[in-house]
Amino acid sequence: MIKNKVVITGGSGFVGTNLIKLLINKTKYKIISIDDYSSGSRSNHINNPRVKYIKGNTVNISKLIKNPKKIKTVFHFGEFARIYQSFLKMNECISSNSVGSNAVFNFCLKNKIKLIYSATSASLGNKGNDKNLSPYAFTKSKNLELLENLKKWFNFK
């Protein structure tokens, strides 16, 4: 089966929208965007027949993607991404960044799909010494740690 699709979580946010533009111009892939619109916007949608927008949460990625065998890569940008607000909305941050990301990781692992994950200077900056400065930085650093272990345990790519 030809893998001719990519998934972008957070596809209606700044990074996701710009990646969609790049993929439209440089590839032939069909693109599926999953976004809960907590920070992304429908006004960022690109009107192109190769792009499909799905309103949904990354926690439900296995239900939202009907035919994972056609997916070549998941670009995972759909996380809670506000440092200051992560103190005010800690449950939302953990749900999105830990539970939602874990669902994306498991979806990719189970279906042998390549994952591109977006790290952050909030957990990598200052030689990693800032990884516990906020709930946001903590969740991102734990995700990086989990991905390193998944790579060792399961040869996850």
At which residue positions do the language-model features occur?
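N-terminal Rossmann-like NAD(P)+-binding domain of SDR-like oxidoreductases, especially those catalyzing
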Residues: 1-157
